[in-house]
């Protein structure tokens, strides 16, 4: 009877474990761990790697060690899917806590920045619409 309770408790705890988001896009189809192992940021605070593109969007894996500086994208809407880690996105005057599995839409022109609150790099899939062809980050004041 006691062993049945232990098995039931173990099964319940496994069901409560956080699920790691999976991404089946381009080079990520073989697994995020393999991709990250091949794309380790040396001493970079932020590393962004393009992973796919369509006529209407471009897809990038972004790794953040510490934080972004406040900025805006003049010509792109941005959708961010957090794949690993946790942190806070400051969007305008609003602080949005984010962790793996969360998503957020950042409209073009909106001042924003991400602050990593974990011990390891935060990793996200960033989707730019229209596709990102050139640098589009324009510095923005903290409460711009």
Predicted segment positions?
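Bacterial N-terminal signal peptides that target proteins for export
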Residues: 1-7
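Bacterial N-terminal signal peptides
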Residues: 7-15
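A short, N-terminal "cap"/entry segment at the start of jelly-roll beta-barrel domains
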Residues: 16-61, 139-144
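Structural motif
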Residues: 58, 86-88, 95, 111, ...
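Conserved short histidine dyad/triad with adjacent acidic residue
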Residues: 58-74
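Short, conserved beta-strand element in jelly-roll/cupin
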Residues: 64, 74-89, 127
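Short acidic-glycine-tyrosine-enriched beta hairpin
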Residues: 94-108
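Ligand-binding loop in jelly-roll beta-barrel domains
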Residues: 108-135
């Amino acid at each position: 009877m006691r062993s049945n309770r232990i098995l039931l408790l173990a099964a319940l705890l496994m069901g409560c474990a956080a699920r790691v988001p999976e991404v089946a896009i381009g080079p990520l189809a073989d697994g995020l761990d393999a991709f990250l192992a091949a794309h380790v940021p040396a001493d970079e605070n932020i590393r962004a790697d393009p992973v796919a593109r369509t006529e209407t969007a471009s897809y990038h894996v972004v790794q953040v060690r510490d934080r972004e500086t406040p900025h805006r994208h003049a010509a792109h809407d941005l959708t961010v899917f957090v794949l690993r880690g946790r942190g806070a996105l400051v969007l305008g005057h609003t602080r949005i806590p984010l962790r793996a599995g969360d998503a957020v839409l950042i409209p073009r022109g909106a001042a924003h920045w991400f602050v990593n609150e974990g011990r390891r790099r935060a990793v996200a899939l960033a989707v730019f619409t229209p596709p990102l062809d050139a640098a589009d980050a324009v510095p923005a004041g903290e409460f711009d």
